Amino acid sequence: MGEVTAEEVEKFLDSNVSFAKQYYNLRYRAKVISDLLGPREAAVDFSNYHALNSVEESEIIFDLLRDFQDNLQAEKCVFNVMKKLCFLLQADRMSLFMYRARNGIAELATRLFNVHKDAVLEECLVAPDSEIVFPLDMGVVGHVALSKKIVNVPNTEEDEHFCDFVDTLTEYQTKNILASPIMNGKDVVAIIMVVNKVDGPHFTENDEEILLKYLNFANLIMKVFHLSYLHNCETRRGQILLWSGSKVFEELTDIERQFHKALYTVRAFLNCDRYSVGLLDMTKQKEFFDVWPVLMGEAPPYAGPRTPDGREINFYKVIDYILHGKEDIKVIPNPPPDHWALVSGLPTYVAQNGLICNIMNAPSEDFFAFQKEPLDESGWMIKNVLSMPIVNKKEEIVGVATFYNRKDGKPFDEMDETLMESLTQFLGWSVLNPDTYELMNKLENRKDIFQDMVKYHVKCDNEEIQTILKTREVYGKEPWECEEEELAEILQGELPDADKYEINKFHFSDLPLTELELVKCGIQMYYELKVVDKFHIPQEALVRFMYSLSKGYRRITYHNWRHGFNVGQTMFSLLVTGKLKRYFTDLEALAMVTAAFCHDIDHRGTNNLYQMKSQNPLAKLHGSSILERHHLEFGKTLLRDESLNIFQNLNRRQHEHAIHMMDIAIIATDLALYFKKRTMFQKIVDQSKTYETQQEWTQYMMLDQTRKEIVMAMMMTACDLSAITKPWEVQSKVALLVAAEFWEQGDLERTVLQQNPIPMMDRNKADELPKLQVGFIDFVCTFVYKEFSRFHEEITPMLDGITNNRKEWKALADEYETKMKGLEEEKQKQQAANQAAAGSQHGGKQPGGGPASKSCCVQ
């Protein structure tokens, strides 16, 4: 095949345009653009000032774009713009002043200084320790920053804003100035200042136009880099808050560990060589033994600095984080005053004033006059510092965080202040966590102490137990030194006979017995249930537990130990005499009788509603069934004591089940729950009548835990109300005790709460007691015993008792009604007689002269 000529190729490409375009894009397009934008020699000669043609100006613009693409450093890009502007404006010098805020005060600092057309970046870039700083109320640049407009000063000697201190400093004479702000929206980012026109007396309007035109490049550069910097700062800020937040919520117990975890985790985002955290002593008031020497004149009073809330400034711990060279963390308890982070006095100053301090040139500040040489062997010296207080939610300064030497050599700026402030503010707020934990810990410790105090006064002591377990008298030793057989022998002689005391009868009365005898009767019930040997209940623990229960009930009118015992005795009678034990295991019977004895322990003589009205702490602790939950917790607290724990030899599963049954039983004594459960109980009673044999029903019930719990709950209600079923001689006395306690609550409501009590609790309506009793029997009590007598006919004596008592109360109520009716009739007769007498005296007319009314009379 012969060689292809150029003409043939051209002809082929002309006739195949799509192929030509595809081939060009694939092979040459990238290279052409790369060559176009790649580095090349400047097409304009900058060695001498001369007028530019349009081609040369285009070349300058293209050079600026290429520089912007190639350079990642803002100062270098702006420097190139300034060099070209020096040539275009034929100016001698140019400078760039960056706008910033330090400690909340705005200022302008040199970043590029003395830029000319032949300048080198390294010579013009100002180091942080060599900055010239202008406040906004000083100099032409300050005026430009405030006005945000371009300023042309033809003659500096005639300008009121001009300040010559830089000329004095540099031995340079500024004759004329052209200055313009670089804006980011409405905010000043920097000021570019052009000085001394070379080819004329001053800068012209044309120069202003050129400056503004080319400042668009500088403006774009500054905007891009400023936004990039802001994005970087916000990213760092987000990372700092995220990571510190995760560590803060990992450590809730101790402020020191919390701060350390958070600050160590975010060290990579803080962008500094070192940082130090000083934790302040939060003591506001000294102990009396520390104050006495001062008051006696033996020690001088504290005259040092104080925090804004009046605390003495005492850094009890300093944590240093060293990030340059080899990373190191140092924790210094009780740091000495000459510690490198405290010797300057800056942390103390920050703690005293609560201000953020940003020191951009540390060696020039009085705080760091001590720094004559490197602080350690690494040769490290403090160059710039950012220090700020750590403030909690109560606005108390809990510590001071100080950051040293920004890694890029520049001083800390406003964004650094914002970022570090976010961190310290978050840490300050997070102090709430360990504070709350400490408070909860103290409350928990106080609770344990109070429980111990209560137990000390409630628990059966070694002298009291000898009234029942007379081991000293019989064996000459303490109960814990005796064998179980020896204790059983003593109890056999001390405990009452169940049949003699009729503790298994529904008509049992506690009135003839002493409280100690009731304790002995309670112990005997456990033996009658045959649970002592089966569950290996320590007999000493059983005696101590029952005696402690009797002491746990308060000495109040009705809800005292006698009531607690009566409820336990009725539960025992329902299980044994009422034959309800067939549905429950021995363990459940043990739990039910124990719950009945515990059900009202530490009762205050007032009901749940009063606890809420009086804002009692119990009402805040328990949302519902307030007193019942308190009785339950009190009983469980006693059982947690090893010397009182009658459940101590149960296995884990048995123990959990026993406690579960106690929970349900005691909470069920809340009458507010009674109306919810009685319909369910009635259905169970109805269902029991559908079974042909008692054995089938018993087997069914034993396997259904829910139904057993409902029956148990209703049994607790029957036990709690059982006083209403006792013989009239007993019931009438007990009813007066109940009424007396209600009246005491009514008195409290009237005097303490300034409220009128309900009729049942109103002492002034004591005569209505029989009527109220009849209503209570009809509305609350009768259903319970009627259904139980249907359920088990052995419980019928309780229904008979309440029926008889209703008749007695009804008779008294009717007698009262008759008496009140007679009094009312007598009153009406007296009123009629008085009316008639008044009418005859005035001739059938009222004293006012009008006719007498036949239907009313004004007394």
UniProtKB/Swiss-Prot annotation:
It catalyses: 3',5'-cyclic GMP + H2O = GMP + H(+). The keyword Cytoplasm does not apply. Residues 841-851 have a biased composition (Gly residues). Residues 830-840 have a biased composition (Low complexity). Its EC number is 3.1.4.35. Its main location: membrane. It holds the Pfam family PDEase_I. It is an enzyme of class 3 (hydrolase). Binds 2 divalent metal cations per subunit. Site 1 may preferentially bind zinc ions, while site 2 has a preference for magnesium and/or manganese ions. It is a lipid-anchor. Its cofactor is a divalent metal cation. A lipid is attached at C856 (S-farnesyl cysteine). GO terms for molecular function: 3',5'-cyclic-AMP phosphodiesterase activity; 3',5'-cyclic-GMP phosphodiesterase activity; metal ion binding. Residues 73-222, 254-431 form the GAF domain. It comes from the Eukaryota. Residues 483-816 form the PDEase domain. GO terms for biological process: cAMP-mediated signaling; retina development in camera-type eye; visual perception. The modification Cysteine methyl ester is found at C856. Disulfide bonds: none annotated. A divalent metal cation 2 binds at D600. Residues 857-859 form a propeptide. Belongs to the cyclic nucleotide phosphodiesterase family. Oligomer composed of two catalytic chains (alpha and beta), an inhibitory chain (gamma) and the delta chain. PANTHER family: CYCLIC NUCLEOTIDE PHOSPHODIESTERASE. This is Rod cGMP-specific 3',5'-cyclic phosphodiesterase subunit alpha.
